[in-house]
Amino acid sequence: GQALSVNHGEVVTDGGRRLQADLLVLAISHPPPSLPSLATPFATHPALIANPWRAGVLATIAPEASVAVMGTGLTMADTVATLTRLGHRGPIAAFSRRGLLSRSNLSGSSEPWPGEYDRGTLRQRLRQIRLDIERAAEQGQAWQVVLDAVRNQGQSIWQGLTVADRQRFLRHLRSYWDVHRYRIAPQVAGVLEQRQRDGSLRVLAARLTALEGDAQKLALTLAPRRCETLRVSADHFILTTGPAHGGLTDSQPLLRQLSQRGLIRADAFGLGLDVDRRSRAIGREGRITPNLLVSGPAARAYFGELMGLPQVADHAAAVADEALRTLGVKQSARCPAF
């Protein structure tokens, strides 16, 4: 069941179970998307699809229905590909502030790129990455091999940046990094390209400025960059904006209770929870909560790259070691390595 609270080493679940624990690990993944404020009055409107992953929800969309999609990243790409597979051919308008699409992954394998990017300022590292992309092209290699090398060094790169450079990255570069880091399969990219070519998919750099609706449809007012206001009428409005990491501490009862007690707090970058180098939670006034560890993407404000399976698995192993040390379990008493 879902954990609701923890007090004096006792975890209470929604099923009424009470579990005794000397140490608690928050191995949480991503929080659900948050509803945009303009969409809140339409939370129960039949045209609004706030969770495109809900079983069978995309199958309810008629083949010729008009669709608006907020967000242009991975979830949008998967949504459009799924709709297309289900026979949808109606008009789709997808929008985000920058209108950036996730790039296509390489098909097949490639040699690892030897670049190193763990020194210098953000600007210096960015310059080196761009130079290496040019070098790779001269050698007949794609930019993806360079970005894979950057991803593999993501934790050391992030931890080596100053706070100011981390903030600059999040403010100016994060959107561009995300569409190159979180890539889509070539087959999905092909679907998007085909639908753009036949005119059934428009991708816009725009903000949602107003939302109205009647009994069946929703009407979106969009403000494109450097263009006049645009009005889009949609039989369905799908939200694909991704997890609401900035609201993690309020996303479920246990985290809300821990936050209210001052045992955890959101990190300064809005990426998840504040932790120290040992993955221990940091709470109110910067106090460490020694018997509360955080594993996985919620700890990425300190560690950096913690989204891919290899990085998450390595971090989980490190958190397990920290838990055993905290509990005083001797090396000889631990499970043997496989």
Predicted regions and their residues:
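Flavin (primarily FAD) cofactor-binding/catalytic cores of flavoenzymes
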Residues: G1-G120, R127-V329, F338
